[in-house]
């Protein structure tokens, strides 16, 4: 409604002698439109988060009752030639993987499978410390797992999309101070023609022509590059947004164990990069509203400033994406193990001795599928 009012007042300005009051009304309607749209987006996000948290709790309750169908069973990782995973049902329906997996990304799923089938002996103790720490954070894990309720983040797809976006060619002119100065001067001149047409005898057609020229310049210089960026992200815009939320959630951690500190440090350094990538992707998506695109380009040069943000992101962050996605996948897998540890508190950490011989001692043994025996 407010958007239609904005257009209506702009039209009235061009066909009536009412002058600046119609422009003021158009500006107020535009501000109201932006405010209502942002409030609606935030409300949708809160509702979706609440529904996702409820689903997480329902799944965990079902898990405690012996139902693992909602979770990934890892069937794709079954290898009949593996030394042990095939014989002891590590992967597949009702498997160990099926009981453990809570990953929110495909990269985390792959990493969890690797931990179970090819563990790194040199990091066993550090990994156990990280799992114990995450197991002690049920509220944090619950909100983290909520990010993967609707669908898992396609880690490889997101990485490919971000690499493709990083390769989009942007002219260096867009970051020049001179470009910004010229753009702001042109915008100020456009607003000046509007004011002069309202308070003097200057024909309103002058403002209309200057606005059309300004809009044509912005679209002509920016539209092609931004469309290329939109094609690069394609259908992965929602996936990238989900991945950004996962990164932000990890950044909220205050780790104490050595492995988590290292991984968190890597991901925390990526927070600004992924957050900016998320903002850019959302802005690219909003360009699908043609009328909104015209208005925001006309009065705010939105495409030009979006292209500047995009160019700065390419320059500052594009080369570090692989390292960051690997760290996120590692934490994702650790969260799954931590959830399993939390759900089975009777399980204890094995104590490794320095003896040369082969020996073992166990008390209160239990099987993950059969329980205590």
Question: Whereabouts are the PLM-identified features?
Answer:
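Alpha-helical coupling/stalk and coiled-coil linker elements that connect catalytic or binding modules
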Residues: 1-373
């Amino acid at each position: 409604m407010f958007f239609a009012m904005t257009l209506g007042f702009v039209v009235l300005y061009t066909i009536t002698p009412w002058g600046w009051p119609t422009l003021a009304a158009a500006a107020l309607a535009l501000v109201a439109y932006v405010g209502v749209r942002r409030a609606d987006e935030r409300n949708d996000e809160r509702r979706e988060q609440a529904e996702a948290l409820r689903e997480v709790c329902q799944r965990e309750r079902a898990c405690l009752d012996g139902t693992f169908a909602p979770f990934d069973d890892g069937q794709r990782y079954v290898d009949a030639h593996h030394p042990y995973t095939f014989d002891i049902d590590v992967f597949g329906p009702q498997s160990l993987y099926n009981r453990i997996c809570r990953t929110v990304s495909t990269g985390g799923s792959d990493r969890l499978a690797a931990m179970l089938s090819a563990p790194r002996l040199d990091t066993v103790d550090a990994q156990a410390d990280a799992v114990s720490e995450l197991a002690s954070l049920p509220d944090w894990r619950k909100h983290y797992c909520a990010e993967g309720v609707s669908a898992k983040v396609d880690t490889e797809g997101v990485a490919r999309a971000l690499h493709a976006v990083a390769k989009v060619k942007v002219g260096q002119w867009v970051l020049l101070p001179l470009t910004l100065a010229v753009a702001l001067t042109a915008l100020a001149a456009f607003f000046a023609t509007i004011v002069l047409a309202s308070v003097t005898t200057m024909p309103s057609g002058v403002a209309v022509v200057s606005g059309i020229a300004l809009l044509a310049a912005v679209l002509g210089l920016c539209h092609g590059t931004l469309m290329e960026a939109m094609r690069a992200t394609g259908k992965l815009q929602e996936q990238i947004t989900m991945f950004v939320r996962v990164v932000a959630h990890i950044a909220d951690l205050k780790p104490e164990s050595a492995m988590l500190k290292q991984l968190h440090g890597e991901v925390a350094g990526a927070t600004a990069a992924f957050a900016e990538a998320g903002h850019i992707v959302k802005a690219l998506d909003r360009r699908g509203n043609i009328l909104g695109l015209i208005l925001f380009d006309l009065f705010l040069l939105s495409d030009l400033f979006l292209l500047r943000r995009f160019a700065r992101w390419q320059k500052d962050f594009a080369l570090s994406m692989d390292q960051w996605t690997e760290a996120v996948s590692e934490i994702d897998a650790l969260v799954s193990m931590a959830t399993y540890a939390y759900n089975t508190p009777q399980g204890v950490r094995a104590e490794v001795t320095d003896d040369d011989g082969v020996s073992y001692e166990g008390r209160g043994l239990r099987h993950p599928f059969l329980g205590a025996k």
